[in-house]
A protein has these predicted regions:
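Substrate/ligand-engaging "lid" and interaction regions
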Residues: 1-518
């Protein structure tokens, strides 16, 4: 059994199928496009494309989504087009069962720069309402390639930001209709990051005489850049899912690694819980995505949801598990949640130190969100996520994931009660020694500050006691912790905790066990 249009007319027990005329949908979508998405990777195929299918199945819309890939074009040329732009989406439930769906909402798949003319044609269409993005935070950066595009004419742009700006200028010339450019990437204030990158390009072209005052004014007035918060764990395709699909009779489900080091397959595997909250700023209208569970609200509320998740209810727990998981030799987040000491640690940290200062966004109840994280999402053994992956770039994550809540506790005068948050910070210093709890060496995950901070921790011998002076000015560096730990009155506690964790083999386990038993 092959994944192509022919399979849609077959009976497939155990699979949800498109409930619409796919050929008619694709024809309408190409002629009168409403939604274009950049970034044809796993997250897009597991989430936005499935949202589009929900609307099509319910008869809430008659057009799907067109997608374009500008970074890793193999995602389109090898994993969409050969399969008639169909995808198998597999939700991995905590009880080991799978919910499987053939997703047919992708009406056309394109690549840049190869399909530049077609992409520009889509932008010229007055029917186009929104252009969305899952291109990672790095995709919005004004890097060397983008700067080269600033020196070219719009028609010669090579980067995604350059092509986007050029296509918007083409829209101005063709119809002048407004448009929403919607980042759906998992980073704070994502709409602002997209807007800054876009206008950096437009400003350079305006200075070079490539953009008229009228076109520039149109871009400022008629283009919107809504903020969003997206949350859905979508790990790389997993061999266990591949085997299950093969057992169902599917052919050609091989997992491959592209030249850009993307792990990809004709299927995607993901968790079932999902959240997408978007600032409701769509000057050209939008698909009725609220009918598929998307929350539309104000920018302030989007920001509040992001803070709830990133500063309290999910990301700090992930980082705590990453640090202690690496020290204790764990290789999966689910495995850590089966460890009584670690499960108790993150649960108590969340409820006793996070929830008292949590930002309540109003549209999502923090306690219910946290409960789902602790009881369904993290313990799911079929989501193959690792502490080693999450430990990447920890120095860049600590200020947001812990610094914000520490700052709120400081304002309330309760920072001295942060027993577990302080232990996480001490745990990271202990992690930097690259010696696990058995005294065996391991390799720290990549981190841009590793060369700066690791020598400080490694200068303190394993099994010895440190003083605050041994850490120099590190404990006062608010760019790492989010607050000056010394000024906050937490540096002594962090060093004391470090010494407990650094006593010798088994000290990390003993410390966590003692905390659990009180």
């Amino acid at each position: 059994m092959k994944l192509n249009n022919a399979v849609l007319s077959q009976s497939l027990p155990g699979y949800a199928l498109p409930q619409y005329d796919r050929q008619a949908m694709a024809r309408r979508s190409r002629q009168q496009p409403t939604w274009l998405h950049f970034g044809a990777g796993n997250l897009f195929r597991a989430f936005p494309a499935v949202l589009a299918q929900r609307l099509l199945n319910a008869g809430e819309t008659d057009t799907g989504v067109l997608c374009c890939e500008a970074y890793d074009t193999d995602a389109v040329t090898q994993f969409l087009r050969p399969y008639d732009d169909l995808t198998l989406s597999v939700s991995l439930l905590a009880d080991g069962s799978m919910e499987k769906e053939v997703v047919g909402s992708i009406a056309q798949s394109l690549t840049l720069p190869q399909d530049r003319c077609r992409v520009e044609e889509i932008f010229r269409a007055p029917s186009l309402q929104m252009v969305s993005f899952t291109i990672t935070e790095k995709g919005y950066a004004v890097n060397a390639a983008v700067k080269e595009d600033m020196g070219r004419a719009p028609g010669e742009a090579q980067t995604l930001l350059g092509a986007l700006a050029a296509c918007c200028l083409a829209r101005f010339e063709a119809c002048g209709a407004p448009l929403a450019l919607v980042s759906m990437d998992n980073c704070s204030q994502n709409g602002e990051k997209l807007r800054e990158g876009f206008f950096a390009m437009l400003d350079a072209w305006k200075a070079a005489g490539h953009v008229s005052p009228e076109a520039y004014a149109w871009a400022q007035e008629k283009l919107s850049f809504p903020w969003s918060m997206i949350d859905k764990i979508t790990p790389r395709p997993h061999e266990s899912v591949q085997k299950a699909l093969a057992a169902d009779g599917w052919e050609g489900m091989d997992i491959q690694v592209t030249g850009k080091n993307t792990y990809i397959a004709p299927f995607v595997n993901t968790e079932k819980p999902q959240y997408l909250v978007i600032e409701d700023d769509f000057p050209a209208g939008r698909p009725p995505l609220e009918k598929a569970g998307v929350l539309f609200t104000s920018r302030d509320t989007v920001n509040a949801v992001e803070r709830m998740k990133v500063c309290t209810c999910l990301n700090p727990l992930h980082t705590a598990l990453a640090i202690f998981g690496c020290l204790l030799g764990h290789t999966s987040i689910a495995g850590e949640m089966a460890d009584p000491d670690l499960r108790d640690f993150v649960t108590t940290m969340a409820y006793e130190e996070g929830m008292p200062v949590v930002i309540d966004p109003g549209v999502i109840e923090p306690k219910a969100f946290l409960e789902e994280v602790l009881t369904q999402r993290f313990p799911n053994p079929f989501i193959p996520d690792t502490p080693q992956r999450i430990a990447t770039d920890t120095s860049q994550k600590l200020p947001i994931r812990f610094g914000v809540d520490m700052g709120l506790h400081l304002e309330r005068g309760t920072a001295g009660q942060l027993q577990r948050i302080a232990l996480v910070l001490a745990g990271w210093l202990r992690y930097l020694k690259a010696v696990d709890d058995q005294g065996q060496p391991f390799t720290c995950s990549p981190d841009p500050l590793l060369e700066k901070v690791q020598p400080i921790a490694q200068a303190i011998p394993f099994g010895t006691q440190a003083t605050q002076e041994d850490f120099g000015s590190l404990l006062e560096d608010a760019s790492i912790w989010g607050v000056d730990l010394k000024a906050a009155g937490l540096s002594a506690l962090v060093v004391e905790d470090f010494n407990r964790l650094n006593q010798g083999p088994g000290a990390v386990r003993t410390t966590l066990e003692q905390l659990r038993k009180g």
